């Protein structure tokens, strides 16, 4: 297929509407296998709007189990109901992905205040309480429903608990839905925050049959008829079910496989296999970008070291360069072990005998990709990482 034919589309095209994969809320009129959760949240929202009963809840589940999708769906439904029920006209909503805005208490509250008020909000120079006061002034009799996605990145930061506590205990009609894939997130919360927190909603992983059903909806609306078959959907669903039932992965694999099949008219197994390889590479990059600051420094140090001892020396030099206090060799070694566990690097332990002792050697297969991912993130404001 020539470049011109590809640009024009038509012959052998597989994807009918790419928007289905990019913004599925335009297609889904309900969310399969999450109806009970949606109803539970809808009841809480109704009591909040109509009976002044504030609530807070935590959406907890592994990646790709529908937490963000349910939150986004509920946000959209509430906006639609505003046209039908005047009680909802005074409800303001704000969705913030804590990781994407930086994760610090200052960054999260700044983003939240911007979304709930009409004023331009400074990201520095005012204390956390002032953000809350700005929100309260803006509401002035109205209600606010706040969605904090990837809230674990906030909770694990110094002062992150203060943000939640102030929101949950604010003298204003604010209800909060928090979203996290860290099943141990409650361990990072202070007792006063836990006592203010409402029930936790657990999102169970999808099984292969459920994933196949979800994929069939995406395929029906997003792909041309006859460009895929039942076996392809089953294959993708089975692969994704093995990894804690990740619907996001399943949908991404189907979309990428369809892109690879463009011009050929049909999605084959080898298209899916290629999509899997690309997906794993992209996930590696995202994992690196999400690492804490000193983990990134440790990883950067391994790029030019063959063993852990040498890497620690390079790491210490990097800490001096970035005006950070180096972690001890023992803690650094623990971080290297964690990076090994994450699959980012590989550590090989070799016993050199009585004279040489035990040495930990470092092996890295994707140095270029890791370097690029580090370069993209190492220009962040490190003073905010601690």
Curated annotation (Swiss-Prot):
Family: Belongs to the CDC6/cdc18 family.
Organism: Sulfurisphaera tokodaii (strain DSM 16993 / JCM 10545 / NBRC 100140 / 7)
Family matches, as Gene3D superfamilies: 1.10.8.60, P-loop containing nucleotide triphosphate hydrolases (3.40.50.300), Winged helix-like DNA-binding domain superfamily/Winged helix DNA-binding domain (1.10.10.10)
Keyword annotations: ATP-binding, DNA replication, Nucleotide-binding
Gene Ontology biological process terms, A to Z: DNA replication
Highest rank taxon of the organism: Archaea
Pfam families assigned: AAA_22 (PF13401), Cdc6_C (PF09079), Cdc6_lid (PF22703)
Protein name: ORC1-type DNA replication protein 3
GO molecular function: ATP binding; ATP hydrolysis activity
Keyword rRNA-binding: no
Residues that, per the record, bind ATP: 65-69, 206
Primary role: Involved in regulation of DNA replication.
